[in-house]
Structures are given as C-alpha cells and as structure tokens.
C-alpha cells in the first residue's frame, strides 16, 4: 500500500504491486505501458502485412512463374512451417533477451527476405521465400509476452486481444493494398512481371522501419529493459533451462496449443485460400476477390479484442470457469459457421457467413490468450510459444490435409471439414483444470491446495 504513491508518480496509468498497468487505454501513448502496446501491435502488423502480401497477387504471380496447384499448396504450407520452430524458440528468447530485442532482431532479419520476392524466378524459389518469410510470424509470441509483462491480470486479456487483433488486421489490409499498388505501378507502362516485383518494396521497408522503432523507443518491462532491469534485489534468479522444462511439463499449455491450432491456425489457412476461393468459385475479378478477403482479416480490428474483453469480463464474474466456458462456446460457434461457409453456394450468402465466421474465429483467438497468462508466470514465454506454435502447426496440418493441391476434395468441402476439426479439437478445453481456480465443470480444490510452485507466481484472478 505504501508503494502506491510512488507508483503514481512514476507511471501515467494506475499499476499493481508489480507495476503492471491495471487500466488499458488504447488511445494513449504514455510510456512505458501504452507506448509498448502501440509498438507491439504496429510491428506485428508489419509482419502480417509482409507474410500475406503474396496471396492477393497470386493470380499474377502464378501466371508469371507458371505455378501448379501443388506449387501453390506447398507454398502455403511452407509459409506456416517456417513459423513453427521460430515460435517455439521465440518464447525462451523473450525470457532471455526480452520482447523488444526479440521483435526487432527477427523483423530486421526477415525484411530482406521480403524484398527478395522481387528476385524469384521459379516455383522452388517461390516456395523457399514463403518458408523464410513465415519466420516473422514468431513475433506474435513476443507481442503477447510483451503485453503480459506490461498489463495486470484484470486487463491482460483485453490488452493481448487488442494488440494481436490490430496486428492481424495487417493480413486483411495487405489484401486491399497490394492489388492497388500493383495496378498503380502498371499504369506507368511497367510490365506486369516487373510491377508485382516492385510492389514488394513496400512491405519490406515497412517491416524494417517498425523494427527500428521498437528497438529505439520500446521498453521491455514497466521498470526498464532486460539488459538493465531495475528488479528488486531479493528476486530469485531464473534458470532458462529450468523454466523451459517447467513450461513443457504443463499440460495446459499443450491443450491451449491444440485449441489455438484450430482458431488462429484456421484463420491463417483462411487468409491463404479465401481470395483464391472467391476468385475461382464465383468468377469475381482480382480486386473484388482481394476486397472480400480483406474483410476477413480486417475484422480483427474489433473481433479479437472482443474475445479478450469477453474473457476478462467472464473472469471477473465467474473466475477461470468463465474464461474456459467462453473459449469453448466461441470457438464451437466458429466451427459451426465454418461448416456452413463451405455449404453456401451463393456469393452474397458466402460473404455474409464469412464475415460472421471471421468474427467468431478471431474472437476465439482472443479468448485463448485471455487464459494463457494465468497458466504459468514463471514460464510465460514458453507457454506463449507453445500456444503460438500450436496456431502455425494447426495451419500447416490443415493446409496439408485439406488444401495442399493434391487433395481430391473440392475447396468448399475442405472448408466444411475444417469446421468439423475446429469443433472436435475445442472439446479438449474441458480437460483444463487449475487447482486454485477450477475448470469448466469442477470448482477449485482449495482444501488440498497448499502452495504449489506454479500458482505462486500467478497474478490473482479477479472474483
């Protein structure tokens, strides 16, 4: 209680005992909490913009490079496969170096890869480039780690949801912008082959600029950076290897990885196939297909934050049980809408169902990361990495099984089957149980709960 006046003097937002903000003001730029928020979402926005800058121009690129259906499918798989290992590694890297350095380093390393899209000349180089660009999506883990380090448990779901949601808008924004840039370049009497190559100057430059902003203007923790932490002298020193194994042994992280694989993983898969789906099935032009696909990604602006807000509100009212039930309900509804999307055979109906589906599948991702910060503060980076990797593993598995180009199933049938997989995998949420807070069907075992190592370092869940 005595530290609160000092906290008010040091910070622009009210904070808890760990100096994490207890309020979330998305239109504020005050350091360090809200400045970190804006740098986190903007840098990840640039990564999504770069990674998904290829699909809206795929019709042109495909013709120029003479890509087959198998090439396109394999490239889609490669774009997610590159993020699997990098997301797993990003959690421990954040624990070791801090989110600011991790984000800046990965973005600066992958920005030249984005620029090298202009040099590809064969299906093999196309697949390789998509694989390497996918590494940048690991910055999602650092994004969520950063927000969980800056915001208290009462608002962490909302902070995570808005930071990731606004960032994911990049996957929709690029669907609008890249065709416009390509069209604009061709108006200067530049050939189609050269125009699409020049268009990739924008995402590469944007990604590099945001990385430098994070590096020079960001701050890892409320009290300083990882290399100069102003931590209490009595805080025990953490061992990275111990924290890694501590996180990997936590079964809740594996379940959240599975469910996230069929919320965010499905979202990634849809980003990859939706423009081409409308282009082929309903005979719309490239710009129209891009605009429809953009609406799917742009919904992240409010849908994922809504999921985080729902998780926090249900946590306040019903504790952890409310968060878990929210996750199951929202993701199951998303699965049902995905099944319906594959069954609708009219353009207007498909667009309407797709918009509803986009809201629920993205909200499910937000609800998931409303639970993640409570699994283990000690191994927060590892748990975030496991969950985030689950998203890309789910995308790879779904793309490989249903949209690889070698499948005999139609795209619409594959979309419906993707919804069935969502519903089935979401059932595993019922297995998550916290001794201190309970689960979906069971209350907390306070009577036999003592002082387990894992729960000691959680932020308290609001009643």
Q: Where do the PLM segments sit?
A:
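Conserved MFS/SLC helix-loop-helix module at the cytosolic interface between two early adjacent transmembrane helices
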Residues: 85-124
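Cytoplasmic helix-loop-helix junction between adjacent transmembrane helices
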Residues: 129-166
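Extracytoplasmic gate region of multi-pass secondary transporters
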Residues: 54-58, 247-305, 365
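Helix-loop-helix hairpin linking two adjacent transmembrane segments in secondary transporters
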Residues: 163-222
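Structural signature of the two symmetry-related core transmembrane helices
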Residues: 101-115, 321-339
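Glycine-rich segments within core transmembrane alpha-helices of 12-TM secondary carriers
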Residues: 157-183, 300, 384-398
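Residue-level signature of mid-helix packing/kink "hotspots" within the transmembrane helices
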Residues: 52, 79-88, 138, 172, ...
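Cytosolic juxtamembrane N-terminal segment immediately preceding the first transmembrane helix
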Residues: 1-49
